[in-house]
């Protein structure tokens, strides 16, 4: 499990964040390092000092394949991988997505309580409401 020393070394080399599909250790120390980190839990065990490990290869993290050149976007809610080949198309859609989310937020604040898509899923049996 990576911990505060590993994150400090990553920060010292210019890293701006750390994402792992494994647990991490030394939570208080990690917070003190100040490098944002995402993991799947906490564990007091030390990392392997002699491997296994590979650098520069595709990796599966959280069920997603991550390749060199991919963009990683992360916040408090989680981590998203944007494949390098799709970066331009994703960027092209950002304004439309922001506008749709802003419009939906305004509708919900005004009292909106259901979406037709959800009702359609309930009506055609693709979703079930549990009272």
Which residue ranges define each predicted feature?
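Feature captures the catalytic cores and cofactor-binding loops of soluble hydro-lyases/lyases
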Residues: 1-68, 82-131
